Amino acid sequence: MDSERGQGTVEWAGMLCVVSLLLLGLVAAGIRVPRAELAQAVADRILCAAALADGCGDEPTLIAAYGSEVGEMVREHMPSLVFEQGSRAVPVDFRRCRSTECGEGPEDGLVHRTEEHLPVTAFVHVVDCREGEETEGVDCSGDRAGNLYLQYWTYYADSATLRGVPIAGAKGYHHDDWEGVQFRIRPDGSVDERASSHNGYNSGLESSRNWGSDAGIGPLKEGAEALGARGVNGWGPETGYLFVSGGSHAGNTFDLTDSNRYTPGRRVHLIPLEDIATTSTAHFAISPPWLKEVWLDPEAEGTS
């Protein structure tokens, strides 16, 4: 990821020169300007125009859907995607792509678009359980009360857990794969994170501790949680990363700062999902987010 940071430094320096020249021109023309505020506004516009951050244009839409405070938090907490080595798939907008061919990107480096120039995309659902702000129809009982939940959903045209294993055939394969990562923001400002993985949720732990959750075997999952081997219902501290397994796209929140295939969070195109959930007539082999239990119960332990 360092290469993008280096490139961004050069672009940022160039942008500052442009901003400075603009401000000098205004001053020379005798126009009074609010210094820092205008500089920031101009810089933001140039960044978007230069496409340095693919997701920078999302914020107005997010604010319109969720209000200024929550809309900005949705943009801020979108994690960076870290893809397993050798994988090609990236999450896309299902309304524009539902085949493997249009949903594949480069095998390494910075990935922000597919080879057919579709943006890396995540859909957003917000469950607000803060006092006086409760989302209508959701479960905000018990420990949920006071929390703000941000759900980011990713769509892939298919899932193949055993892709590349000749003897497996079609086993483990299905069309329409919905995965995602969720954040729980507590009243004290602390943030938890968990990622969908097969039948449950995981966060930053070695796979052996998550077998019960992945397989949907309640006693194994509950035993691991009772022993403190994993967080309850897969929650753990926010890392700002979503690790995506190849083939199955099962997730985890591994804190990986060095990967050869990644998408920075700020370059993921974000789309509010609430209106789509009420109007979409699309059919899926796997239940879409709005038909999953966690859509209304943000502490649900399963992914169905």
Positions of the model-derived regions?
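Short beta-strand micro-motifs enriched in acidic
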Residues: 184-188
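A domain-level signal for the mature, folded cores of soluble proteins
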Residues: 59-179, 189-304
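Aliphatic-rich helix starts adjacent to a transmembrane/signal segment
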Residues: 22, 26-60
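N-terminal single-pass transmembrane signal-anchor helix
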Residues: 4-29
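Actinobacteria-biased recognition of intrinsically disordered, low-complexity terminal regions
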Residues: 1-5, 55-57
